UniProtKB/Swiss-Prot annotation:
Main location: virion
Source species of the chain: Influenza A virus (strain A/USA:Memphis/10/1996 H1N1)
Regulation: The M2 protein from most influenza A strains is inhibited by amantadine and rimantadine, resulting in viral uncoating incapacity. Emergence of amantadine-resistant variants is usually rapid.
Residues linked to a glycan: N20
Subunit-level organization: Homotetramer; composed of two disulfide-linked dimers held together by non-covalent interactions. May interact with matrix protein 1.
Superkingdom field: Viruses
Name listed for the protein in its UniProt record: Matrix protein 2
Record topology, Intravirion segments: 44-97
Region (Disordered), start-end ranges: 60-88
Transmembrane intervals: 23-43
Entries under InterPro entries matching the protein: Flu_M2
Record PTM Phosphoserine, positions in chain: S64, S93
Membrane topology: Single-pass type III membrane protein
Length: 97
């Protein structure tokens, strides 16, 4: 009998399920997969901001500076800072009277 066709019936004033074949390996595997899926879904919903922030910033790291002389590293930092400073000119300053 399939789990999809099981019927819940009142047994001794409690609701129960007549599952005679619950020791079937397929049923056990499906139950374990279902429980693991539920746990992972709950963790994802609770910590989705942290999880996706790690993925987002982890993949957007700058180029590796291993083996690059310090002078070139400083030049690169200055170029990056100048690019950021140039972008600040695009914002409009609004003053309220």
């Amino acid at each position: 009998m399939s789990l999809l066709t099981e019927v819940e019936t009142p047994i001794r004033n409690e609701w129960g399920c007549r599952c005679n074949d619950s020791s079937d390996p397929l049923v056990v595997a499906a139950s374990i997969i279902g429980i693991v899926h539920l746990i992972l879904w709950i963790i994802d919903r609770l910590f989705f901001k942290c999880i996706y922030r790690i993925f987002k910033h982890g993949l957007k790291r700058g180029p590796s500076t291993e083996g690059v002389p310090e002078s070139m590293r400083e030049e690169y930092r200055e170029e990056q800072q100048n690019a950021v400073d140039a972008d600040e000119g695009h914002f409009v300053s609004i003053e309220l009277e």
